[in-house]
């Protein structure tokens, strides 16, 4: 059964630090074709580094998408989802507009893990920042405590 978002005026914003989020945007559009979308890819500053840098660049992108009329922004970037999402949700959104939303990709990805794991072992290939955050193992073990998780940082991502 297809779930619909509550009334979301304006387009849905999708952000990534590069082009990878376009695959996520395509899937979102398949599931929710009735919405308009704005994609923001920050190729100029790709390969974000420290928490502070990831948070600041992600916050800037979210604010830009809000300024463009989006009331929902999806962080299609694992690094931004791992390192900046919670801070933006807890610290920034209440001061901007509590009715707006920012969502990440880690939790929805993890919800699919049980369906795809045939041997109770999942490998995660991601940026060093995403691997160091341990966001995937933490979320996977909340839903699937029996699944073993191995993470490998890919330095060129």
Regions picked out by a protein language model, each given a short descriptive name:
Residues 1-157:
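Non-catalytic structural scaffold of enzyme domains
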């Amino acid at each position: 059964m297809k779930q619909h978002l509550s009334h979301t005026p304006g387009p849905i914003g999708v952000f990534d630090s590069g082009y990878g989020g376009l695959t996520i945007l395509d899937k979102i559009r398949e599931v929710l074709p009735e919405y308009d979308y704005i994609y923001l890819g920050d190729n100029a500053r790709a390969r974000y580094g420290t928490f502070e840098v990831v948070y600041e660049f992600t916050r800037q992108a979210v604010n830009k998408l809000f300024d463009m009329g989006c009331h929902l922004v999806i962080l299609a970037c694992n690094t931004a989802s791992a390192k900046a999402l919670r801070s933006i949700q807890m610290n920034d959104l209440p001061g901007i507009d509590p009715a707006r939303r920012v969502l990440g990709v880690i939790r929805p990805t993890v919800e699919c893990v049980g369906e795809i794991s045939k041997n109770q072992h999942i490998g995660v290939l991601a940026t060093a920042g995403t691997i160091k955050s341990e966001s995937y193992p933490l979320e996977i073990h909340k839903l699937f405590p029996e699944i073993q998780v191995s993470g490998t940082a890919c330095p060129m991502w």
